[in-house]
Amino acid sequence: MEPMLPEAGEAALLSSYAPQASGSMGVDPDPITGLVSTSAAPLVRVEEAPKFELESYIANYTGRTRFNRLYLIGTCSSYLAVDALKAAIAEAKSGKDVARYLRAVQALADVAPNEPEATIDSDWVERSQKVVKAETDRLEHELRGYKNNLIKESIRMGNEELGQHYHRIGDLTSAFKAYSRMRDFCTTPSHIASMLFKIINVAIERGDWLNVQSNVHRLRSQGGKPEEQAKHQPKISAAMGLSQLHSGSYLEAANSFIATDPSLGDTFNEVLTSNDVAVYGGLCALASMDRNELQRRVLDNSSFRNFLELEPHIRRAISFFCNSKFRPCLEILEAYRADYLLDIHLQRHVQVLYNRIRTKSIQQYLIPFNRVSLESMAKIFVLGNPTSQSSQSDSKSAFVQELISLIQDGTLDARIDLEKHVLVSTQGDKRIEVQEAVLDSLDNYVREAHLRLLRSNIIRAGLEVRPLGEDRRTKLEERGKKGHSAIGNLLRATGMKQ
């Protein structure tokens, strides 16, 4: 397995995932069909066999995402290329999107030119194009009639049918426009919610993450019955999490996926499944939360636990991380790397997420130590055969170079002694810092107690304290601080001697 990703850091890895006005993964759709071409983006080649079974995996999805996922697997996986592309061709022929059928046939011809499916079915193409043109003309003619009659409900339904037609044939730009035109003719909250979800689905397929987020906010802000809002919440949170994942906002994405209600079930399978929520949310949380947050907000979360039960290896990885068992955690993630590299939404974030999780693991491992041998670290963080770990303390080894890189960019506050083969922490003495904080707190406590006693004695004596001028008050406060700091200095000196 050889991920063909740029090595210029997270910025380069995520640069093609910044929110776009249109297109998917930073690629503009075809102006005629609205299709997103992936040929311009560097593909991640996956040589290893994934753990999932293709038919069972794709059966969890509905709608256009089935083809998109099959096509991605077929063009990225050496092991599943032929089977996935054959399934993608069959999926395309079950619909009316001629352009995606031609793409799938071309992709199969590149890897297996002798397969029967690698030849274009010209009759089907011609027949489908005629059907699509006739259907488009009919729907547009009906919509013009509705507009002439000025019946709002008919106009809304006409735009909806036209948008669904454009979406089915892959003209995502026209589908987006048709759904957007429904806005002025929606008369009930349920109509508005239905329209916004259709726009969100098209925006997700286009990779238009700004539009996904803006329409999610509209869904959240619109009124409606409490039961309707509760029904929409899971899909809203999942869509928002997906847009934040693609934007590289992993902590926000984790929060959104964790907030997704388990009632999501299979209601959003045209975009993602409950298993996807568990994987996306778990990986984003591992990459962005500390151990306390992971334990409290993920493992102890009774709601998100329902998702984690669908992907128990994610739950185990998080548990191992929280218990400082970093090697088993990293081994689990590495075992599922091929699966995640074949996921349409996760693929180009896998390297960034894995790097962050690994860096966090190294940081957490070093916290209790002032000095640790490189060999003992290699036993935990160098995955693979144990026989290869003995040479990992060498200055030219990949592991030592990784540590040097983390030290140079300020991630690790440490230095490496290559002569003794140890990593030495340069952090300050935590005990002295705690002692200083306690003594400062004691100073504040003594001063506060003195002021309270003084006020109590003044009131008991029946004296009246008139407001002081600003200058005199400042001088008295400074004099009081000097007197009370002497107590703190004495305690500090005594404490240091002890």
Swiss-Prot record:
Source superkingdom: Eukaryota
Protein name: COP9 signalosome complex subunit 1
Record's subunit section: Component of the COP9 signalosome (CSN) complex.
Keywords: Cytoplasm, Nucleus, Signalosome
Location in the cell: Cytoplasm; Nucleus
Cellular component annotations (GO), alphabetically ordered: COP9 signalosome; cytoplasm
Leader sequence segment: none
Gene: csnA
Source organism (scientific name): Emericella nidulans (strain FGSC A4 / ATCC 38163 / CBS 112.46 / NRRL 194 / M139) (Aspergillus nidulans)
Ranges for domain PCI: 249-430
Pfam family, one: RPN7
UniProt-listed SMART domains: PINT (SM00088)
Free-text function comment from the UniProt entry: Component of the COP9 signalosome (CSN) complex that acts as an regulator of the ubiquitin (Ubl) conjugation pathway by mediating the deneddylation of the cullin subunit of SCF-type E3 ubiquitin-protein ligase complexes. The CSN complex seems to link protein degradation to sexual development. Required for fruit body formation.
InterPro entries in the cross-refs: PCI_dom, Rpn7/CSN1, Rpn7_N, WH_DNA-bd_sf
